[in-house]
């Protein structure tokens, strides 16, 4: 609802007006392997300053770390690091930007590594920020993110959803027939 309220209260002006929900990194990690997250820097006004997709973040004990060289070196990330889980609020302007940037992305990246060539949404958002074409309001969440990255994550996620249903946060039947 917060993203809807933000987008409903503004429209694109001299800059595209977008929004995103950011989570604390530690609330998004799995015990079962590495994850990809958009690591965010937020300015004093609560706007996204930049976002860098880190495609291999792992928990090592109580520390979250990422590597960009297949594990040869690791960089620490603070537990309060804000990350994107791709919960974005865009105006329709994002569609033309995604379309315009897709073919150049493929031309640059497809021949290098076709099996790992992924068009990450945060890459486009970061380009728009650097070009001064967009402003992204960051809505911070303190909630835990539940997702199934690995099959071993499924039980934890289903147990968490059941707990939310038992606690009254969700109805007993989420999807009525």
Question: Which ranges hold each PLM region?
Answer:
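Residue-level signal for well-ordered alpha-helical positions
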Residues: 32, 54, 100-101, 160
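Catalytic beta-strand/loop signature of glycosyltransferases that borders the donor
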Residues: 82, 137-143
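A C-terminal functional module that forms or caps the active site or interfaces directly
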Residues: 99-133
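Hydrophobic alpha-helical segments
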Residues: 127-135, 160-167
